[in-house]
């Protein structure tokens, strides 16, 4: 839902004080007339730059003159242009270049001066002179996209500006410059749908009353204009408040103001050029820029808003916006529900609602004063990435007619608007105003701050940072309220030439910072703005101009601002809020980080890092001392502030902070009248009690600041004695009571804070002790567990080592026993033969294993054979390998135990470091607690000093009171009033305080009751004495009456003397009673304070004892840890010993392994010798026992071997049969699939051929009909000609033509019938040929299989064992190859086979496979037929290659190797049979072959040579397809050549060949 914003000008009602003036600015009438008539000047709307603010029409609907009027840069300052330069600088441009062409990538770009206006127009010209006509203009409001073009152009820092009609490429000199330009230009396409507002407030459209002014004032008022629409806009609560605001301001320093004359101004006059922030360009000026002094203005009328003549940018390029005489106050509906803004709203609205009334009264009082303040601001730019704004405040002396004028000029908060809340944050710091008097003031504090410098930027700077607008002193103060308070130019009423200056002392800073996301830890760049107590961050400065806020942070909620060296970015710092939320920021340099830290800490009220904590308090005390006015009565000096700890801010209440920040900290009151003083104190107490104690700590500082602003220094009013002393006494009593209540409230607050701090300290101490105890117990448990685990592992390792030692000893003993056994056997068998000894020596092996080998003694060496020896050898070898594996496993376990020991050592070191860290932290916390206790004692001593000072003041007031009692009537009045008050006190209830709910108020109430009772006793005694004095007076009067006749003069004198004496006595008695009551009260208080001191000392002793206990616990834990460390050291030593033992054992194992290896080598040598000796023994045995050998044994042995071989052969044959069956089944399935595929292809080809023939017949019929029609038409023409020639020739010609036509018709009909018959015959022949080929191939395959079966049977029937062995070997090798191929199939092989077959039919076709040339190539290219004709003359090996692919595992499984050459030939024959002619078949018909087929079939039909139609048809065919004859001749001529055409060409030219043969036969017959 979008609403159109209509900016109207409504003149305000004239004020009652002045009549309405007829003179107004001329722009109001111009705007109303411009809407009805044609708009003569296009002025862009502030919300939608493409619309005019006068007529609300689009830019395109305006005339060229109106647009040119907007574009011009006026040199006359009285008529400024409506648009401004947002950014300018030198860039490089590539005009209309196509970067897809590599030539443009190497060209040089053109350097041009770019100017971006605020209405979205981007122009570039050759130089930076304003008179130069721009070369091109880009409307950024129509731009679709602004992106980086580095990949497209190949140039770094390039940008692509994509518009609907063209793409413009630009680039900067550096990456920063191009990024700045990209950020600014990319905001235009992104903000197309962002200009619509949802609401306007017509109530804010108020203009103050006008008065006749000079031309200079009018030009000044039109020149000063609000140049930006800020995100935060505050509105006045009513029209009257706005009128009061505007009426209290004056515009120019040269304008004069008379008493009672109304002030002439408009709202647009408040938005001066010098208030502009100048950040809309998105860049800052470099530090090394030269500053230039401002030249005097052209005239006095434009002194405030004029521009520098020497500044070429400011004088020629910059054009001020045409300001409307009246503008409406608007509020943008903020629809962003961000958490930060909501939190700030929640924390601030409580304060704002409570103090709304007070602030509004202060504002009314401030606005009703007739003071005039001047304002002059300049700016200073510090660095490229940030901008610091230091607020310079100069104090001026003005007359003060009302005490409320000293209060800060603030405005009431709007409770329902977020911008009002944000402005409340900004306005939280009050300004300090000095009071002037006719007399010379005392020493005042002059605030010396840095004077901002005015920089000027040359236009030719290629970085583009123009900074054409001056910077605003307070950027957030964009509304008229704040400008009227802080930045209004006026002239002093005294007529001095130099106006006084006042500025807001707000913290302000801007710059680029990197912000880290808490979830993803990614860094993003934002434009940060610190204004007052709010830290805003935007995407870029342009978003700040438009008010598009990314987030806001309340600086008052910060508890720490510290550097962050552990961050991934350099120059990082961390902000922590009261709810433990962290915000990590990073700057681009250390200097900027330090400046940000300083400004943020000062804005948050935190102490600086590099300065001592006392400095801020001392400076504040010094400032307050300087601001105090000279008093008529002596004031006690303020006590110096104690050491400033971080806990002070945390535990300080709002009331304490307010009193400390106010001027009377240390002194109870400034010397002001008692009535005003008591009222102010009561009001401050009420405001303190109204604050909620449950508010979060985020509002702590705001409350402190508000209290501080409430308690500003009061005016000095000289004390005037009242005519009656009774009122004075009453007022003094009230003041004393108020002071006593204040002292009691303060003491109660101090006690409450002390109790809270003590409770928190004790709770923290207990928590830390519990935490330390738990951590120590955990550490002990973990250490004990680790020690237990280590001990278990060590015991296990020791047991394993012992087992290994036992097994080694057992193995060594076994080896020694075996050696002895071998020696004994050798000694026993030494007498035997040499052969037997060698046999025994080599048959018995050496047992060298680590396992149990006791069974070696049971071995009979005579019964050992070769197999048993091999088995024994394998068994021994396996045992030895097991022993080696066990040794390796032990080594691995040893390594694992070493690694575990290292990990335990590391864990122990980490625990020790953690313990030391904990000890350090505990020591630091103990020091902090001691420091806090010391701070509390200092505060207690300062409170005692204040109590003493208050006692002195009470004594002085008592003296004054005793001296002021004069007269009897006054004393009676005073006593009656005191009596009445006591009666009221008795009857009424004591007032409840805000802290009555707490238990700490019960002793105070009891003390107050005691004090009231004592006062009642005193009053009763004084009343009795007064009654006695009255009775004495009555008696004296009666005596006087009786004695009047005797001596009237003496009696009167005596009566007067007695009265005087009585009065003096009564006064002395009353004063003594009052002194006694005061002394009693002070004594009671002293007793209470002593009791509290004793309690505090007891608490201190208790804390000291707790500290001693904690120290003892720490010492005990240290001793425990030392013992644990000693145990660890002893265990380390034991572990080292164990490691040494393990090393020794590993060395012994290595030696034993070497020994085993040597023994193995020796065993191998012995085995070789044993084998040789066995061979020799066999030869000797054969030679000796050749004659006695038994033939039956040989036969049995050979029969067993033959049986084994036969079983093997049977197994191989069964495997072959199964494989053969599997192969045949696979082949049959493949054959069936191929037959089905070929049948389907055949059917499709036949259907296509029939469709082609039908289409050809239809085409021939249509061609014949057309030809007949042409012939008939031609015949008619010739017939008409012949008729014209004569009737004689007509008869003969007609007969001849009729005969020709009849013959032609008959021939056409006959040939069409013949052609259709031949086509049908050809189709039938083709089908028969396919069936014959398939049958032939199947028959050949079956024949080959039968031959294979015969071969297998022959192999099976053969009785030759050698052939069987060879056959089985080949079978097993083939089986292995078959298995390998079945497991992994290799790449397919291309087999080429040449086979030439001829058939008995006339249409002889070769059954070879297809050539590599595709049919589309031969038909699309007319030269392809010639290439095929040339390829037909090539050798037959290249022509007849087959592309049929068979996997190698199928070939290997289907072929059985044979020993003779016949198997090889049969195998090749099987390859040829498998490679059938139809395997590579493809249908010959294609949809795009129709024309060629028609031409081939029509051009070679057997037509009579005498027919004209045949001749013309041949000519047309020869002209249309000259290559067709070559195709047919090349395909038909070599009939006996084995290189025959493929099936593609066969089906294509079958009908043509048949017709050709018929034509040849007819020619031969003729």
From Swiss-Prot:
SMART domains: PH. InterPro entries: Actin_Cytoskeleton_Reg (IPR052223), M-RIP_PH (IPR039597), PH-like_dom_sf (IPR011993), PH_domain (IPR001849). Residues 271-293 have a biased composition (Acidic residues). Pfam families: PH. Residues 646-663, 976-989, 1423-1438 have a biased composition (Basic and acidic residues). GO terms for molecular function: actin filament binding. Residues 1-32, 194-318, 373-415, 483-509, 627-728, 976-1004, 1375-1438, 1514-1544 are annotated as: Disordered. Residues 84-190, 506-605 form the PH domain. Residues 1-16, 23-32, 392-405, 990-1003, 1393-1414, 1520-1536 have a biased composition (Low complexity). One of its GO terms (cellular component) is actin cytoskeleton. Keywords: Repeat. Residues 211-224, 236-269, 373-382, 487-496, 627-636 have a biased composition (Polar residues). It comes from the Eukaryota. CDD domains: PH_M-RIP, PH_RIP. PANTHER family: PLECKSTRIN HOMOLOGY PH DOMAIN-CONTAINING PROTEIN, PROTEIN OUTSPREAD. This is Protein outspread. The gene is osp.
């Amino acid at each position: 839902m979008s609403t159109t914003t209509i900016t109207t000008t409504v003149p305000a009602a004239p004020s009652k004080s002045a009549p309405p003036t007829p003179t107004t600015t001329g722009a109001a009438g111009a705007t109303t007339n411009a809407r009805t008539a044609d708009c003569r000047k296009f002025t862009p709307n502030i919300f939608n730059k493409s619309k005019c603010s006068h007529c609300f029409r689009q830019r395109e609907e305006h005339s060229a003159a109106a647009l040119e009027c907007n574009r011009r840069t006026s040199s006359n300052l009285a008529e400024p242009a409506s648009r401004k330069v947002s950014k300018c600088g030198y860039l490089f441009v590539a005009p209309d270049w196509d970067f897809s062409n590599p030539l443009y990538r190497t060209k040089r770009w053109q350097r041009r001066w770019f100017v971006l206006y605020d209405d979205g127009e981007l122009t570039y010209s050759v130089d930076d002179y304003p008179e130069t006509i721009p070369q091109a203009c880009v409307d950024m409001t129509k731009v679709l996209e602004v992106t980086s073009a580095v990949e497209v152009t190949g140039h770094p820092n390039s940008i692509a500006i994509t518009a609907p009609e063209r793409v413009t490429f630009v680039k900067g000199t550096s990456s920063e410059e191009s990024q700045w330009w990209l950020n600014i230009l990319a905001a235009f396409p992104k903000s197309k749908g962002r200009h619509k507002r949802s609401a306007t407030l017509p109530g804010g459209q108020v203009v103050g009353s006008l008065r006749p002014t000079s031309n200079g004032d009018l030009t000044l008022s039109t020149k000063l204009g609000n140049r930006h629409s800020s995100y935060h806009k505050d509105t006045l609560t009513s029209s009257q408040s706005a009128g009061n605001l505007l009426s209290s301001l004056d515009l120019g320093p040269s304008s004069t103001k008379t008493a009672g004359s109304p002030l002439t101004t408009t709202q647009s006059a408040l938005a001066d050029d010098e208030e502009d922030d100048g950040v809309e360009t998105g860049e800052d000026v470099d530090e090394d820029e030269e500053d230039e002094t401002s030249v005097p203005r052209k005239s006095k009328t434009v002194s405030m808003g004029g521009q520098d003549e020497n500044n070429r940018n400011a004088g020629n390029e910059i054009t001020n916006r045409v300001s409307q005489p009246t503008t409406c106050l608007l509020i943008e509906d903020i629809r962003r529900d961000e958490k930060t803004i909501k939190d700030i709203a929640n924390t601030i609205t409580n304060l704002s609602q409570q103090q709304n009334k007070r602030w509004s009264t202060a504002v009314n009082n401030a606005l009703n004063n007739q003071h005039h303040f001047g304002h002059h601001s300049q700016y200073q730019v510090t660095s490229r990435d940030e901008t610091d704004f230091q607020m310079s405040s100069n104090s001026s002396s003005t007359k003060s007619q009302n005490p409320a004028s000293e209060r800060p000029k603030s405005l009431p908060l709007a409770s329902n608007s977020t911008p009002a809340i944000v402005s409340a944050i900004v306005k939280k710091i009050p300004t300090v105003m000095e009071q002037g008097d006719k007399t010379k003031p005392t020493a005042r504090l002059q605030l010396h701050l840095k004077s901002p410098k005015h920089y000027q930027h040359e236009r030719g700077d290629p970085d583009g940072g123009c900074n054409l607008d001056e910077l605003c002193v307070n950027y957030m103060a964009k509304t008229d309220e704040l400008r009227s308070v802080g930045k209004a130019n006026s002239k002093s009423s005294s007529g001095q030439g130099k106006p006084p200056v006042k500025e807001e002392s707000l913290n302000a800073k801007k710059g680029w910072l990197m912000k880290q996301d808490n979830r993803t830890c990614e860094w993003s760049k934002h434009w940060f703005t610190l204004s007052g107590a709010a830290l805003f961050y935007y995407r870029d400065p342009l978003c700040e101009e438009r008010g598009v806020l990314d987030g806001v942070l309340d600086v008052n909620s910060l508890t720490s601002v510290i550097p962050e060296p552990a961050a991934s970015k350099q120059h990082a710092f961390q902000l922590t809020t009261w709810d433990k939320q962290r915000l990590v920021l990073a700057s681009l340099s250390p200097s900027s980080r330090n400046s940000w830290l300083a400004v943020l800490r000062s804005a948050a009220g935190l102490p600086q890092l590099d300065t001592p904590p006392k400095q801020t308090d001392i400076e504040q005390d010094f400032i307050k001392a300087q601001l105090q006015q000279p008093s008529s009565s002596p004031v006690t000096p303020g006590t110096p502030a104690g050491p400033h700890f971080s806990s002070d801010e945390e535990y300080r209440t709002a009331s304490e902070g307010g009193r400390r920040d106010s001027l009377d900290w240390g002194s109870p009151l400034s010397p002001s009248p008692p009535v005003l003083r008591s009222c102010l104190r009561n009001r401050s107490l009420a405001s303190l009690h109204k604050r909620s104690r449950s508010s979060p700590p985020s509002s702590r500082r705001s409350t402190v600041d508000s209290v501080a602003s409430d308690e500003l220094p009061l005016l000095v009013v000289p004390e005037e004695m009242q005519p009656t002393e009774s009122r004075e006494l009453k007022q003094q009593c009230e003041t004393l009571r108020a002071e006593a209540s204040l002292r009691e409230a303060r003491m109660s607050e101090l006690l409450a804070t002390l109790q809270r701090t003590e409770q928190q300290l004790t709770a923290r101490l207990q928590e830390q002790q519990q935490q330390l105890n738990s951590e120590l117990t955990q550490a002990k448990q973990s250490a004990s567990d680790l020690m237990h685990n280590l001990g278990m592992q060590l015991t296990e390792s020791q047991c394993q080592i012992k087992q290994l030692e036992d097994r080694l000893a057992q193995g060594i003993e076994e080896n020694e026993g075996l050696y002895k056994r071998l020696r004994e056997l050798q000694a026993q068998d030494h007498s035997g033969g040499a052969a037997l000894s060698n046999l025994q020596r080599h048959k018995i092996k050496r047992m060298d294993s680590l396992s149990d080998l006791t069974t070696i003694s049971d071995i009979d060496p005579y019964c050992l054979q070769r197999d048993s020896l091999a088995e024994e050898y394998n068994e021994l070898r396996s045992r030895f390998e097991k022993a080696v594996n066990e040794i390796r496993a032990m080594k691995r376990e040893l390594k694992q135990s070493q690694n575990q020991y290292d990990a335990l050592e590391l864990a122990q070191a980490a625990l020790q470091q953690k313990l030391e860290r904990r000890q350090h932290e505990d020591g630091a916390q103990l020091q902090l607690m001691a420091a806090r206790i010391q701070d509390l004692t200092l505060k207690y001593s300062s409170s005692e000093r204040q109590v003493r000072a208050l006692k002195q003041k009470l004594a002085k007031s008592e003296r004054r009171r005793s001296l002021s009692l004069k007269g009897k009537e006054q004393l009676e009045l005073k006593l009656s009033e005191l009596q009445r008050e006591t009666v009221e006190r008795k009857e009424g209830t004591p007032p409840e305080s805000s802290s009555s709910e707490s238990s700490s108020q019960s002793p105070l109430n009891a003390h107050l009751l005691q004090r009231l009772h004592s006062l009642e006793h005193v009053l009763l005694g004084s009343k009795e004495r007064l009654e006695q004095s009255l009775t004495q007076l009555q008696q004296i009067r009666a005596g006087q009456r009786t004695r009047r006749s005797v001596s009237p003069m003496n009696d009167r004198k005596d009566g007067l003397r007695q009265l005087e004496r009585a009065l003096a006595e009564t006064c002395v008695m009353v004063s003594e009673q009052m002194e006694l009551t005061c002394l009693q009260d002070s004594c009671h208080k002293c007793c209470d304070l002593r009791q509290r001191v004793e309690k505090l000392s007891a608490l201190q002793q208790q804390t000291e004892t707790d500290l001693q206990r904690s120290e003892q616990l720490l010492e005990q834990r240290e001793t425990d840890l030392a013992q644990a460390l000693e145990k660890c050291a002893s265990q380390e030593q034991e572990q080292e010993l164990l490691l040494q033992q393990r090393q020794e054992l590993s060395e012994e194992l290595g030696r034993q392994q070497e020994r085993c290896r040597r023994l193995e080598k020796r065993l191998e040598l012995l085995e070789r010798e044993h084998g040789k000796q066995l061979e020799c023994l066999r030869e000797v045995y054969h030679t000796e026992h050749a004659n006695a050998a038994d033939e039956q044994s040989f036969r049995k042995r050979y029969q067993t071997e033959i049986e084994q071989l036969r079983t093997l052969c049977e197994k191989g044959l069964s495997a072959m049969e199964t494989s053969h069956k599997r192969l045949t089944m696979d082949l049959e399935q493949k054959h069936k699939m191929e037959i089905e595929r070929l049948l389907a292809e055949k059917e499709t080809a036949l259907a296509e051929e029939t469709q082609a023939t039908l289409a050809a017949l239809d085409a021939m019929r249509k061609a014949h009909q057309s030809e007949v029609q042409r012939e008939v038409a031609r015949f008619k023409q010739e017939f008409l000609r012949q008729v014209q020639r004569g009737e004689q020739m007509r008869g003969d010609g007609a007969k001849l033509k009729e005969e020709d036509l009849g013959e032609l018709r008959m021939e056409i009909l006959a040939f069409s019938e013949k052609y259709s018959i031949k086509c049908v015959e050809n189709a039938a022949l083709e089908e028969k040929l396919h069936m014959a080929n398939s049958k032939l191939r199947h028959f050949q395959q079956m024949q080959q299989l039968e031959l294979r079966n015969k071969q297998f049977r022959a192999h099976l029937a053969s009785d030759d064992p050698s052939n069987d062995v060879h056959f089985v070997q080949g079978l097993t090798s083939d089986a292995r190859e078959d298995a390998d191929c079945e497991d992994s199939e290799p790449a397919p092989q291309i087999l080429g086979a040449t086979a030439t077959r001829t058939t008995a039919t006339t249409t002889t076709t070769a059954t070879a496979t297809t050539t590599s040339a595709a049919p589309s190539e031969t038909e699309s290219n007319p030269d392809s037929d010639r290439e095929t004709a040339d390829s037909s003359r090539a050798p037959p090996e290249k022509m007849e290659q087959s592309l049929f692919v068979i996997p190698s595992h199928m070939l290997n499984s289907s072929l059985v190797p044979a020993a003779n050459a016949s198997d090889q030939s049969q195998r090749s024959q099987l390859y040829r049979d498998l490679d059938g002619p139809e395997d590579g078949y493809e249908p010959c018909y294609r949809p795009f072959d129709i024309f060629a087929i028609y031409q081939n079939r029509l051009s070679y039909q057997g037509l009579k040579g005498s027919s004209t139609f045949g001749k013309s048809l041949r000519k047309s065919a020869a002209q249309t397809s000259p290559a067709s004859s070559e195709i047919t001749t090349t395909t038909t001529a070599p009939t006996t050549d084995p290189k025959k055409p493929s099936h593609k060409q066969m089906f294509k030219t079958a009908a043509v060949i048949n017709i050709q043969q018929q034509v040849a036969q007819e020619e031969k017959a003729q």
